[in-house]
Design a protein with these regions (language model features):
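Amphipathic alpha-helical segments in well-structured domains
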Residues: 44, 48-49
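C-terminal substrate-binding subdomain of Rossmann-fold SDR/epimerase-dehydratase oxidoreductases
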Residues: 55-175
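Residues that scaffold the ATP/ADP-binding catalytic core of kinase and kinase-like folds
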Residues: 39-40, 156
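Hydrophobic alpha-helix immediately C-terminal to the catalytic Tyr-X-X-X-Lys motif of short-chain
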Residues: 12, 16, 20, 51, ...
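Conserved sequence/active-site signature of Rossmann-fold short-chain dehydrogenase/reductase
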Residues: 29, 36-38, 79, 103
Length: 175
């Protein structure tokens, strides 16, 4: 599973960094940003990025499943602010999740926000790769590792300023 391999490689890299820092007396702080909204490359293959690109191209917003996966998001300026908080106030050897408590949504909710953020575009949310034409049954999945707890970064004074809807609008404009 590619997602599992990615997660394991990140944990390994964090462990190596902390061990190296302890051995050589270095100051290491770890940032774990959630998906960061901002300008998106047209070739970006991440699920949420494809929705932004579709809206930027005035195309239907397509979901290839029921949209139940839940993610944390943060706008780029808030992510940069969190990184500065970590650099200036974070504790060496600690890892900090960067996310916005008000931006934990399912992909279905994210798609609807992309649509509602641009009412002038008359975008529609479409479910594809179905044998029938009906919308797939929806049941939000339980919280997954894609939703990050940001209590530790908030203890450093981090407070996101950009709403998810504004972050989506800005991302579409910048794409």
């Amino acid at each position: 599973d590619a997602d599992s391999a990615y997660a394991q490689s990140m944990r390994s890299a964090e462990t190596l960094a902390v061990c190296y820092a302890e051995k050589f007396g270095m100051n290491v702080k770890i940032a774990r940003p959630c998906p960061t909204l901002g300008g998106v490359r047209m070739s970006d293959e991440r699920k949420w990025a494809k929705l932004i690109v579709s809206a930027a191209k005035n195309q239907s917003i397509m979901l290839t499943d029921n949209g139940g996966e839940k993610f944390s998001f943060c706008y780029v300026t808030d992510t940069v602010s969190a990184l500065i908080d970590i650099l200036l106030n974070g504790k060496s050897g600690e890892a900090y999740n960067i996310s916005n408590d008000n931006a934990n949504v399912t992909m279905r909710e994210f798609a609807q926000l992309v649509k509602s953020a641009n009412p002038e575009k008359n975008l529609s949310v479409v479910f594809v790769h179905r044998k029938d034409e009906e919308e797939p049954e929806f049941s939000p999945s339980s919280p997954t590792p894609y939703v990050l707890c940001n209590d530790k970064i908030k203890s450093l004074g981090f407070s996101p300023k950009t709403t998810l809807k504004d972050g989506i609008k800005r991302s579409i404009r910048a794409t």
